[in-house]
Every structure is written in C-alpha cells, then in structure tokens.
Amino acid sequence: MGVVGQFNDLSFDFSVYDMVMMGRTPHKNLMEPDNKEDYEIVHNALKKVNLTTYSDRSYLTLSGGEKQRVILARAIAQEPKFLILDEPTNHLDIKYQLQIFSIVKSLKIGVLAALHDLSMAATYCDILYVVKNGEIVTYGKPNEILTKELIKSVYEIDCEIYTNPITGEMAIAYKMPKY
C-alpha cells in the first residue's frame, strides 16, 4: 500500500532520488543494497511525475507542489496494489493537478482519495463517498449522486452542474456567496 499525504515536511536533507528510492524499502531485506531493478523503477517513477532532472536536488529546497510530486513518485516506486491519497493536488498548479490524476488513473490500482475539488473528483473517480461532519451522506457514481441539492446541503453553497464542453465530463461552477 502506498500513501501520499498532503503534508510532507521533513527535517532531513535527502536528495529527490533518495526520497523516491525509499519507496523500494518494503521490497528489501535488512541491509540489502539497491539493485538494477530498483534504479529502473525509481527512474521510471521520476519520469512519470516529470522530475527526472530534479534527481540530485535537495528535497528541502523544493516547492510544495514539487514535494508532492516526489512523494507520489515514491509511492509509485513502491509498486503498490492500493494507494491512499490525502488531497494529493493540494499544492499543485493546474497542469500538475491534471497530470497527477491522470498518472494515478493510469496505474490501474485501487485508490482511496480524500478530495475537496468536486469537479476533479467527478472526472477521475469511479465512486464517490460524500462526507459531512465525519458521516457518510451518500455514495455512488459521480454523475448519479452529485446534484445541486446535495452540494447545497453538504457544502452550503449554490452551484450549477454542467458538461464541460472541452472534456465532456461533469463540471461544477460555484456561485459566490454574499457576505
């Protein structure tokens, strides 16, 4: 199982490459050295998240979004059958948000993700669980459960739900609240 949290601060100064190589640890015995297969897997994981040129950089010098992509690469290097994501696109520019979700979807493994962006969730998730105050309100396919009424009830905000003319996917536009 791989995990990508939303907060990934460290006190130790590891290179990006070493951070991703740590994803190989579950596959090793105590003191077992890295091998050719590990190097290839780490390189491919860095390539997937577009960070191969960052290999020698210090993890501590990276932006929040870059750190998030390193942590995803580390999880990919683990070769998990299941991935837990806690706001995986929290610090990312839009380009990388889309890239991260596309990468995760391409892994074809089980994923449990906590997301607040309902349009992204509707686009990339097969099943949604809508939670309010720690309780499951409803669950199902995004196009079956995400309604204006549900969003108003759970998030206390008005919205319009429409089909994105570019992607053909469900999208949600929120109405600005008046204060």
Residue ranges, per PLM feature:
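Conserved catalytic motifs of ABC-family nucleotide-binding domains
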Residues: 79
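Conserved ABC ATPase signature
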Residues: 58-62, 66
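Catalytic Walker B motif of ABC-type/P-loop ATPase nucleotide-binding domains
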Residues: 83-87
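Hydrophobic anchor residue at the start of the ABC signature
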Residues: 72-73, 100
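ABC ATPase nucleotide-binding domains
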Residues: 148, 153-179
